[in-house]
From Swiss-Prot:
Family: Belongs to the LDH/MDH superfamily. LDH family.
Catalytic activity: (S)-lactate + NAD(+) = pyruvate + NADH + H(+)
Subunit structure: Homotetramer.
Protein name: L-lactate dehydrogenase
Example of a GO biological process term: glycolytic process
Organism: Lactobacillus delbrueckii subsp. bulgaricus (strain ATCC BAA-365 / Lb-18)
Positions annotated as active site in the UniProt record: H174 (proton acceptor)
Lineage: Bacteria, Bacillati, Bacillota, Bacilli, Lactobacillales
Subcellular location: Cytoplasm
Function statement: Catalyzes the conversion of lactate to pyruvate.
A Pfam family it matches: Ldh_1_C
């Protein structure tokens, strides 16, 4: 079976994703669609030079009609977040962009899997599913996977342990109402909260650092893209290779955590070649459960405001 990916949006995230994907798995065809057709064509030429090392991949600039026989459509297109702007502030700007993408992709006959990383990702993933009419398992958002990576990096630095020994998640909205699932976090097989120094003040400091890191990067260099691009590559690789992968993604909830709203929210889920296989409901303490439900309410209220 041919492995074909259509990338919509060739900005910093999209361009780095394309680079990472070719280094992560074998792709038979990668088509890049962007309003700036010269940039898309230029990136294809640049990426083509990598194939000497990564293996042969057909690379070209294209349009939405190229989704017809694609396995995955990755949406990174959108207005970037400005310093001081919340992800939810972006909704009105990016909703119109999303509609202009999803409608022609579906009209092409696309029957694969949507992967969304444009912000606010939980809302735009929910809207992608509603606009496309696709089964919920075939629409995935990057969710809190980047937040969770930042949490693991921070804990590894503080505890001076390898990153791979840290098992910790950020859940909820990829944005202001996200929270750390400290009560279930494990480091080297030991509960995080059993480690010396993991006081309430220390946990608050870690949470603040993780929450503010994205804004700090934006202030210093204008945008974040390396982390989310690599996360996208991992997600698409799991789909193309049909390998089970557990990540905290924007996934549809069906009563997990007592949330019955028709929304996508950052939660641990298993993905593979069929899309989202199932949600893994993590144990939360009372405070975390309240935060999860409050985060869902934030997303639902924003969606309701769109009419």
């Amino acid at each position: 079976m041919s492995r074909k990916v259509l990338l919509v949006g060739d900005g910093a995230v999209g361009s780095n994703f394309a680079n990472d994907l070719l280094q992560t798995t074998q792709v038979d065809e990668l088509v890049i669609c962007d309003l700036n057709k010269d940039r898309a064509a230029g990136d294809c030429l640049d990426l083509e030079d990598m194939t000497y090392f990564t293996g042969q991949t057909k690379l070209r600039a294209g349009d939405y009609s190229d989704a017809a026989d694609a396995d995955v459509v990755v949406i990174t297109a959108g207005v970037p977040r400005k310093p001081g702007e919340s992800r939810l502030d972006l909704i009105k700007k990016n909703e119109a962009i999303l509609r202009s993408i999803v409608d022609p992709v579906v009209a092409s006959g696309f029957s694969g899997i949507f992967v969304v990383s444009a912000n606010p990702v939980d809302i735009l993933t929910t809207l992608t599913q509603k606009l496309s009419g696709f089964p919920k398992k075939r629409v995935i958002g990057t969710g809190t996977s980047l937040d969770s990576a930042r949490l693991r990096v921070e804990l590894a630095k503080r505890l001076q342990v390898p990153i791979e020994s840290v098992n910790a998640w950020v859940l909820g909205e990829h944005g202001d109402s996200s929270f750390e699932n400290f009560s279930s976090a494990v480091v080297n097989g030991k509960p995080l909260l059993d480690y010396p120094g993991m006081t309430e003040a220390a946990l608050d400091e870690i949470e603040a650092h993780v929450r503010e890191k994205g804004s700090e990067i934006i202030v210093k260099k204008g945008a974040t893209y390396y982390g989310v691009a690599m996360m996208l590559a991992k997600i698409v690789t799991a789909i193309l290779e049909n390998n089970d992968l557990a990540l905290p993604l924007s996934a549809p909830l069906h009563g997990e955590y007592g949330i019955k709203d028709e929304i996508y929210l950052g939660t641990l889920a298993i993905i593979n070649g069929q899309g989202i296989s199932h949600v893994l409901e993590l144990p939360l303490n009372d405070s975390e459960l309240a935060k999860m439900r409050a985060s869902a309410a934030t997303i639902k209220a924003t969606l309701d405001s769109l009419g």
